C-alpha cells in the first residue's frame, strides 16, 4: 500500500508531479529534509551550471526509478517490495528485499533526495577534479555534451599509461573500444519492475559522465588473485554515495550509507569469488543471448556448505568445495526477466560467470547492472574493501571453479 505525495525535480518538468511514497516511510522524515554534504559544496559558473543541471536531472531520474523498482510488489508476493535471490545453493533462496532495514533506509534516503531536490543539489557535482575516475571515451562520450565538458581522462589513456600488465592492457583496449555497444542497444532492457528505462539508451549523459573506475586493472597484491580478463573487462560508476556525484554525509542528522551506481562486466569472464562486509545488490538489465548465459553463485556466511579453518578477532577464514559432485547446482541463472534482483548479505561469498559463446559478437557484449551497497557509512567494517577469495591449494592465486575455495570473512560489527 502506498499514498501520494508531491515532489519536484523530475527530468521533464518543473511542475510538481505526483509520486507514490511507500507506506513504511514517515512523511515527517521526507518533507523538508536537511542535508549535510560530504566535503565542500561544489561551485560552478553560470556557463558550466547548464551541464550540471542536465547531469542532475538524469541522476534524479535514475534514483527515482531505482527506488520505485525496489518497492514494486505487483508480482513479487511481497508488500512494498521486489523479491531478491540471496543464496544460489540448495535450489536457491529468496526474500522480500525491503524486509531488510538497510534497504528501507536506502530507499528513504532516495526519497529524501528526490522530494527535496533543490536542497540536495548542493551536494552534487561532476567531480571533474578527481583523478581516479574516468570516461569510457569513444562514442559514449562523443554523444554527451556533458561528458565532453567534464573532459575526464579516458579509458584508453588509463590503460595505455597506468596499466603495466600487457595482457590486461589488451583486454582493456577491447573493453574500451566496445564499451558503447556494451551499454546500449536492444539487448539492454530494464526488468519489468522499473517504471521506465534508465540505461545508457535513455540517460546518455549520466552513463557517459558518471565517472567510471576499472577497479582491478592496476597492479596490486589483491589482483594476484584475479583474472586478467576481469582486470581489463570490468568497471563500475557511482552516482550517489561517498565516491559518487551526489555526496551526502547526513540527512536529518543521520548518516547516509547508500552507494548507488552501475556496473559493466565483459562476457567470457568469471568475476572471481569474493565477499565484503557491506550488503550489496544488483539489478540485471541484459537480455541473454542464450539460456544460462548469466550465472551467479551466492553462498551465505552461515551456510552448512562452509567450514571454518582459522579465525582471529577480526577475520574468519573459511573454505568450501566448488568441485564437489553436482557443484553446478550451486549456481543459478538470471537475466533482466529471471531473478533480475540479487541481494548479498554482508560476507556472502559470490561470483558471476558470464558466458559469451552464444554471442554473435562477444567482444561487443557485457552484463550491465544497476548496482548498490546499502550501509557503507559504518567504517568499522572497512566498507570499501572487496576481498577476493583464493585457491585453497595454491594460496595467493585466483580461485577457479572446480576446486576448494578459501575466503577471509570480516567479523562484522554492529
Swiss-Prot record:
Broad class of where this protein is predominantly found: periplasm
This protein's GO CC annotations: periplasmic space
EC nos: 4.4.1.3
Location of the protein in the cell: Periplasm
InterPro entries assigned: RmlC-like_jellyroll
Signal peptide: 1-18
Record has Lyase as a keyword: yes
Swiss-Prot/TrEMBL catalytic activity: S,S-dimethyl-beta-propiothetin = acrylate + dimethyl sulfide + H(+)
Gene3D superfamilies xrefs: Jelly Rolls
Main enzyme class: lyase
Stated induction or repression of this protein's expression: The maximal level of transcription is observed under anaerobic conditions in the presence of acrylate or methacrylate. Anaerobiosis is necessary but not sufficient to increase the expression.
Keyword Lyase set for record: yes
Domain of life: Bacteria
Function: Catalyzes the cleavage of dimethylsulfoniopropionate (DMSP) into dimethyl sulfide (DMS) and acrylate.
Protein name: Dimethylsulfoniopropionate lyase DddY
Record organism: Shewanella woodyi (strain ATCC 51908 / MS32)
Gene that this sequence comes from: dddY
Amino acid at each position: 500500500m502506498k499514498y501520494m505525495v508531491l515532489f519536484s525535480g523530475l527530468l521533464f518538468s518543473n511542475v510538481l508531479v505526483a509520486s507514490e511514497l511507500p507506506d513504511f516511510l514517515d512523511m515527517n522524515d521526507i518533507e523538508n529534509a536537511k542535508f549535510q554534504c560530504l566535503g565542500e559544496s561544489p561551485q560552478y559558473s553560470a556557463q558550466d551550471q547548464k551541464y550540471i543541471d542536465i547531469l542532475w536531472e538524469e541522476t534524479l531520474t535514475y534514483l527515482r526509478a531505482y527506488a520505485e523498482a525496489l518497492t514494486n510488489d505487483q508480482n513479487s508476493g511481497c508488500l512494498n517490495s521486489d523479491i531478491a535471490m540471496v543464496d544460489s545453493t540448495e535450489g536457491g533462496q529468496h526474500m522480500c528485499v525491503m524486509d531488510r532495514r538497510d534497504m528501507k533506509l536506502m530507499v528513504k534516503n532516495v526519497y529524501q533526495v528526490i522530494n527535496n531536490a533543490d536542497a540536495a543539489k548542493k551536494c552534487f557535482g561532476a567531480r571533474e577534479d578527481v583523478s581516479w575516475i574516468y570516461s569510457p571515451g569513444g562514442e559514449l562520450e562523443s554523444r554527451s555534451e556533458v561528458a565532453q565538458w567534464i573532459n575526464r581522462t579516458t579509458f584508453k589513456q588509463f590503460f595505455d599509461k597506468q596499466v603495466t600488465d600487457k595482457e590486461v592492457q589488451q583486454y582493456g583496449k577491447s573493453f574500451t573500444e566496445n564499451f558503447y555497444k556494451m551499454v546500449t542497444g536492444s539487448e539492454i532492457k530494464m526488468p519489468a519492475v522499473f517504471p521506465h528505462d534508465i540505461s545508457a539508451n535513455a540517460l546518455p549523459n549520466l552513463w557517459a559522465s558518471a565517472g567510471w573506475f576499472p577497479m582491478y586493472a592496476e597492479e596490486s597484491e589483491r589482483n594476484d588473485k584475479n583474472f586478467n580478463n576481469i582486470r581489463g573487462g570490468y568497471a563500475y560508476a557511482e552516482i550517489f554515495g561517498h565516491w559518487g556525484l551526489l555526496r551526502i554525509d547526513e540527512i536529518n542528522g543521520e548518516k547516509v550509507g547508500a552507494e548507488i551506481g552501475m556496473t559493466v562486466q565483459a562476457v567470457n569472464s568469471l568475476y572471481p569469488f569474493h565477499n565484503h562486509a557491506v550488503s550489496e545488490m544488483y539489478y540485471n538489465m541484459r537480455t541473454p543471448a542464450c539460456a544460462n548465459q548469466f550465472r551467479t553463485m551466492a553462498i551465505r556466511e552461515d551456510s552448512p556448505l562452509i567450514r571454518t579453518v582459522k579465525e582471529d578477532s577480526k577475520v574468519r577464514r573459511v573454505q568450501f568445495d566448488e568441485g564437489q559432485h553436482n557443484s553446478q547446482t550451486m549456481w543459478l541463472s538470471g537475466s533482466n526477466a529471471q531473478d533480475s534482483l540479487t541481494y548479498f548479505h554482508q560476507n556472502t561469498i559470490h561470483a558471476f560467470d558470464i558466458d559469451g559463446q552464444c554471442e554473435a559478437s562477444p567482444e561487443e557484449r557485457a552484463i550491465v547492472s544497476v548496482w548498490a551497497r546499502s550501509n557503507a557509512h559504518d567504517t568499522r567494517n572497512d566498507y570499501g574493501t572487496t576481498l577476493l577469495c583464493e585457491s585453497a591449494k595454491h594460496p595467493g592465486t585466483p580461485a577457479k571453479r572446480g576446486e576448494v575455495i578459501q575466503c577471509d570473512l570480516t567479523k562484522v560489527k554492529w
